[in-house]
């Protein structure tokens, strides 16, 4: 059974980033979390996995010396978690499919970086479970930004 409670996205994002710090350092990628408290009612484990998967992908598909910027905030009745990287980016023709199970943009890169191809599919379903939305912006050679928004209880 999934237990819902009040979960603040800022310390959750900080925890996910800290747990990925060694992976980021191994790729010479900096990861910074900033923002403000943004509480939501949800399943802590699922919300953590959303933050973790987004940060993990931002590190895996980044460039040497790149960066990952994680921002958390509350705006217009929503809590928002945004992960922006300076990585390889996603070609426009693949952007509509990256949240599908097992879908990989570059299968050769995926073998080198590991993973199952389920991370972003999980993110999509966990965000939907929390009645949230996902927005993607990406440019090849410049990086990717994924923003997830969750309704905040009044």
What are the residue ranges of the model-derived segments?
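Conserved micro-motifs of the catalytic ATP-binding
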Residues: 1-3, 35, 39-45
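Short conserved segments within the C-terminal catalytic ATPase subdomain
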Residues: 23-33
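Acidic ATP/Mg2+-coordinating residue in the GHKL
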Residues: 85
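Short conserved segment of the HATPase_c
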Residues: 90-104, 124
């Amino acid at each position: 059974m999934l237990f819902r409670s009040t979960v603040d996205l800022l310390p959750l994002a900080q925890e996910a980033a800290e747990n990925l710090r060694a992976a980021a350092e191994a790729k010479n990628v900096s990861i910074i979390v900033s923002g403000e408290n943004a509480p939501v009612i949800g399943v802590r484990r699922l919300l953590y996995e959303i933050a973790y998967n987004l940060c993990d992908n931002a590190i895996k598909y980044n460039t040497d010396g790149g960066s990952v910027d994680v921002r958390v905030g509350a705006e217009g009745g929503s809590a928002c978690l945004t992960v922006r990287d300076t990585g390889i980016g996603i070609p426009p023709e693949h952007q509509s499919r990256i949240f599908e199970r097992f879908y990989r943009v570059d299968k050769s890169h995926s073998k080198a970086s590991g993973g199952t191809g389920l991370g972003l599919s999980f993110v999509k379903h966990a965000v939907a479970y929390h009645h949230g939305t996902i927005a993607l912006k990406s440019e090849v050679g410049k990086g990717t930004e994924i923003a997830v928004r969750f309704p905040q209880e009044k």
